[in-house]
Amino acid sequence: MKLEPLLLEISEYCRQVGLAESTFGRAAINDGKLVSRLRNGGRITTETLDRIRGYMAANPAGEGRRLIVQRRTPSPRHQDAALGPTAEQQSSTRNQALASLAAQELSPSLAEQQITRVTNEPSVDARQNFRFYDNRQKYLLFVNTCSEKWEIANRVSLELANLHPRPPALRVFDAGVGDGSVLARVMRSMHDRFPTMPFFIAGKEISLEDVRLTLQKVADRFFEHPGTVLVLTNMAYADAPRLSVRSLKAASSLVWHEVALRGNTSHSFEEQITALEPFLAANWKATVNPQTGGSVYERPVVLVLYREDHRFLLDPIIPRLGATAANYDLVIASQPYRARASTEFKARRVIAPLVRALGPGGRLIGIHSYGHDPAMEIVHKVWPNDEPFITNRHDLLKAVKTELGAAGRDLNFNANSDARSLFRYDMHTLPSEVEGSIGTSTLFAAWNAAIYVAQVEDERLAPVVARGDYLDATRQVLQEHGGLWFYDESFVISRRRD
């Protein structure tokens, strides 16, 4: 049998019900790797197919059932186990088991978080307004199959030659840390160019999962460059560079956590960073803005990391609550906004606040998707009139200049030529993977990358997935070009030196 229709059906079912694909596999046939094996060309028996179909039929997606995870205190272990389950408990066993599987993926601490109910109420608020590019699985698939992070780090590193840092430290702000791949690579480049200079590096990231991934990459950075102060925060663009919030209500709930790492090996640093997991799980929380559907923090958090044995050297640059200046030498603004957001929004809410954080001689490098590449050919084969990249660098710089007004007189706005501004990144494939018959896993990865970059919403994806012709469009583009690549464009805003 052809597996593509079944994979599409499972994917759509999981999206509607709100299950991860691994959870679906465990719930349906007790195999969490079911979907991944099918995508990699695995086979199933007719009996297994019947079990999968039977599970979806017994738990229809159309009823709007959602899995709700709530906190509660675990039941005491000494409760009377001799009393058997009630009839009500027996009738809910199936739903509780399914909910528990979901909790393993949604909850960072199963000892504190348990499933208490499955609701049949349809969701109508913005929290259920799922956006494709916020999906963790698809985000991680994109960053691990494409070289964008590498190329962005290479482009940012070119700006280091133009910096003229002043004592006491080279100051860098990353306006969207993501999984930390770009920042870690840039930190290596910084050490290569400025091996003895103290670093103050601050990064904004609201996603708990991305903060975890970032922290996994920095232990060796403290070993190679001990004169480093690393700060992570979930504050908004207007507040994050100065590590202070303007709202009195938010300021009263601010969590400021300083960690002086002991020892002198990457292993000891990693152990102490990993031990921060309970702190992160308890404090790095986000909710959904009911008006915009975007993520906002529950409380502002600042996490400060540095080596204890270098505290004396780093004392002048360790940030203090309420007394942190911006004055950054380099600001990295890599994909910091939605592609389809208005030019005015990008200029006013994102770029302008970051530009104001530049110190004398400081440079902001902005990077966003450009289009005009094979990936957009895939999108246009499915949605011929779709144009996700509505703002080019020229229009954005003009809007930022207007927004800043007189405050922008000492700034240079550098759009640069296409030859210098544009750069390409690729999806990783072997030549044999795009010649002749292209495997399903390669097609799915290419399709995922194309619609992730184009930020296609789920509402438009559902009918396309149901038709199933999107893989044919993807196959045609891959065979025509011998692979898949994308273009980003960059721009620089620099402040004049005194």
Model-identified regions with their sequence ranges:
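N-terminal, positively charged/glycine-rich alpha-helical extensions of SAM-dependent methyltransferases
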Residues: 77, 94-138, 266-286
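A short glycine-rich, Lys/Arg-flanked "PGG" loop and its adjoining helix->strand segment in the class I
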Residues: 324-325, 345-360
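Conserved class I S-adenosyl-L-methionine
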Residues: 167-180, 202
